[in-house]
Regions:
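Primarily recognizes the serine-hydrolase "nucleophile elbow" in alpha/beta-hydrolase
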Residues: 121-192
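Structural cue for short, hydrophobic secondary-structure segments
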Residues: 56-59, 87, 230
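N-terminal cap/lid segment of alpha/beta-hydrolase-fold proteins
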Residues: 2-47
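Mobile cap/lid helix-loop segments that gate and shape the active-site cleft of serine hydrolases
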Residues: 15-17, 23, 182, 187-220
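Short, surface-exposed "cap/lid" segments of acyl-processing enzymes
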Residues: 44-77
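Catalytic nucleophile-loop/oxyanion-hole region of alpha/beta-hydrolase
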Residues: 65-75, 86-136
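Short beta-strand/loop motif that positions the catalytic acidic residue
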Residues: 230-232, 236
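C-terminal catalytic histidine-bearing segment of alpha/beta-hydrolase fold enzymes
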Residues: 98, 231, 242-291
Length: 291
């Protein structure tokens, strides 16, 4: 007998991935590797002033088969709501036998983190040419699933351990973060085998998990002092809502209030599906921080 939850998830994924990729207005490199690029989408609608910048970090369990192209319809959707959009690519995991994974492993340590840090650091120089007339001071970072993790991490670089090469001396210039079904709490995610143990793979395998956790787990990098909202489907079977709830609890224990919007009858993929009502909720959450 087919599990109804699995059937629903498959239908939601099929809808989210049914949209053709949307070509960007321009693309710029932030490094020499082919994956070190950012696609830029100019706002398609006028807002009350210069358009805010939304940085998008795609999901896919940090694994190589899943790149930024699957989230371009979402980037275009945001542009049609009046946002300027920067869709970031970054290096992901391929096949590394020493990590004892079947198929592509999740992430590359430290390259995945190198790239996200480098991309965010490069934006102030790239945006004036790629998106003239927008307001980079009103910048919000969003990301889905594994990209939600990276969005939270990018906003927490100023609280990384002193030895971290990505540490910033001050908070990044962000209006806030909107993380969508994020892998936000690595211990909780691993306890539920989220994406086949992807969090441990991202850190280089079980042998490195504990040592690298303070450098990579958003739940260990609190408080950030940056406005943060998580949007989560209650019926998500890919990244269950308990992962987001564990992050919110960790933030509260650190003295920080984090917003959590739980959507009834919603799974993992409608959050980035322009045809889904949940996507409009995401846009509104971003707008509340950006404008």
């Amino acid at each position: 007998m087919t599990d109804p939850a699995v059937e629903r998830d498959a239908a939601e994924a099929a809808s989210a991935f049914s949209h053709p990729p949307v070509e960007p207005d321009t693309t710029a490199a932030y490094g020499e590797h082919p994956d070190q690029v950012i696609d830029f989408y100019a706002p398609r609608a006028a807002g009350p002033g210069p358009a805010p910048l939304v940085v998008v970090l795609h999901g896919g369990a940090w694994r190589a088969p899943y790149d930024r192209h699957h989230i371009t319809p979402f980037a275009d959707f945001l542009a049609r709501q009046g946002f300027a959009v920067a869709n970031v690519e970054y290096r992901r995991g391929s096949s590394f036998p020493h990590q004892q994974a079947e198929g592509p492993i999740a992430g590359r340590w430290p390259e995945t983190f190198d790239d996200v840090a480098a991309a965010l650091d490069a934006l102030p120089a790239l945006v004036p040419t790629a998106l003239p007339g927008i307001d980079p001071r009103r910048m919000v970072v969003t990301g889905h699933s594994a990209g939600g993790h990276l969005a939270l991490w990018a906003a927490a670089r100023h609280v990384l351990p002193a030895a971290a090469p990505w540490r910033l001396p001050a908070p990044p210039p962000l209006r806030g973060v909107v993380a969508l079904a994020p892998i936000a709490h690595f211990r909780e995610a691993e306890s539920r085998d989220v994406c086949g143990g992807a969090s441990a793979q991202l850190l280089g395998g079980p042998a490195h998990f504990e040592l690298r956790l303070p450098y990579a787990d958003p739940a260990a990098l609190l408080p950030t002092g940056i406005a943060t909202t998580l949007v989560q489907g209650r019926d998500d079977i890919v990244v269950p809502p308990e992962v987001a709830e564990a992050y919110v609890d960790a933030a509260a224990q650190a003295g920080e209030m984090v917003g959590l919007t739980l959507l009834d009858g919603v799974g993992h993929f409608p959050l980035i599906d322009p045809a889904a009502d949940a996507c409009a909720v995401v846009s509104e959450e971003i707008a509340q921080l950006a404008w």
